[in-house]
Amino acid sequence: MPEEKVATKKIKLSALCELCNGRKAVMKRPKNLQKLCKECFYNVFETEIHNTIADANLFQPGDKVAIGASGGKDSTVLASVLKTLNERYDYRLELVLLSIDEGIKGYRDDSLATVKRNQAQYNMALEIISYKDLYNWSMDEIVSCAGIRSSCTYCGVLRRQALDRGAAKLGINHVVTGHNADDMAETVLMNLLRGDTARLEKSCTILTQSTGSPIKRSKPFKYSYQKEIVLYAHYKKLDYFSTECSYAPEAFRGTARELLKSLEAIRPSCIMDIIYSGEHLALAPKKKRTQQYKNKKKTQVDNEHEINADGSITIGTREFKDGNRCENCGYLTSNKICKACVLLAGLEMNRAKVSVDNNTAVDGAAKLTKTLEQLSF
């Protein structure tokens, strides 16, 4: 199994841990440049995550919690740390692994083998939900039909719904994911660059729950740096899968990630600074918004998704209240038809164009991602 490179500069072996002053330091923390030995790093890393959980009151005794497990470093470390904290602090949680098989040959099949080993290593139950069983489409088939540029748009929507359906199948009302501080900062940047103010306001929420849904989602790694997660996995010799998804290079998130790396080289605290900014962002009252934005809103059609005879889809953008049920599948949505059903309907009709707002046609599957990124569902 390929091992991910540990992205830290070597420090002098003569340097002592700045906490215990007794053991040699082996790493320098990216968030505060503190030099630590392995033992002190483990303790600090785990304690900070416990404090995040306690401060946000994420869990209650007796909760059954599903860990979104991909086999990657984030979810593997999350499973390991939650097992440790559950025993150390007596959370009294029932932890299970919930994995999604998107159907990406040469990637997901290998990573699921890692998840199955984690199941035995952490003595947790495992449930695997596949796109093919749930939607009758694998990601490889979707990419073949809609193009690689659309892959992350489809996968993000379908994966989120698959996790919820998997949790419901297991009778679980809380799903935790391995989204870390870097992911949170990237999301803020992505929404800022897109001008997506609605999502920008919610980019840094640690606990989310749709109106009418019993399933909560939380991110215990919200303040944990990706570099430290990699170091923890490396020093603990955890079993994880480190190959990137074959479709990921086409994702817009990669652009935000490169921008974040450049910013971090200039200002090491930028990740936490961006998260702090995201936490305190709030939309201005409607009366203060620009006239241009108001005029744009007036030209938008009702949010009724219509599948046309030629395979195109007319997508409106009038807001519906959170908590509606999709008329097709019954899944919670803020619209009449959920986003997953809209995407799947287009695939079933092998569409090559999408009608947006005033029925203007957008030709070519390669433009689908750009179109969907501009819509608020």
From Swiss-Prot:
Plays a central role in 2-thiolation of mcm(5)S(2)U at tRNA wobble positions of tRNA(Lys), tRNA(Glu) and tRNA(Gln). Directly binds tRNAs and probably acts by catalyzing adenylation of tRNAs, an intermediate required for 2-thiolation. It is unclear whether it acts as a sulfurtransferase that transfers sulfur from thiocarboxylated URM1 onto the uridine of tRNAs at wobble position. Prior mcm(5) tRNA modification by the elongator complex is required for 2-thiolation. May also be involved in protein urmylation. The keyword Signal does not apply. It comes from Debaryomyces hansenii (strain ATCC 36239 / CBS 767 / BCRC 21394 / JCM 1990 / NBRC 0083 / IGC 2968) (Yeast). Pathway: tRNA modification; 5-methoxycarbonylmethyl-2-thiouridine-tRNA biosynthesis. It holds the Pfam family ATP_bind_3. It comes from the Eukaryota. GO terms for cellular component: cytosol; cytosolic tRNA wobble base thiouridylase complex; mitochondrion. It is found in: Cytoplasm. Disulfide bonds: none annotated. This is Cytoplasmic tRNA 2-thiolation protein 1. Belongs to the TtcA family. CTU1/NCS6/ATPBD3 subfamily. It is an enzyme of class 2 (transferase). Keywords: Cytoplasm, RNA-binding, Transferase, tRNA processing, tRNA-binding. Coiled coil: none annotated. GO terms for biological process: protein urmylation; tRNA thio-modification; tRNA wobble position uridine thiolation; tRNA wobble uridine modification. HAMAP family: CTU1. One of its GO terms (molecular function) is tRNA binding. Its EC number is 2.7.7.-.
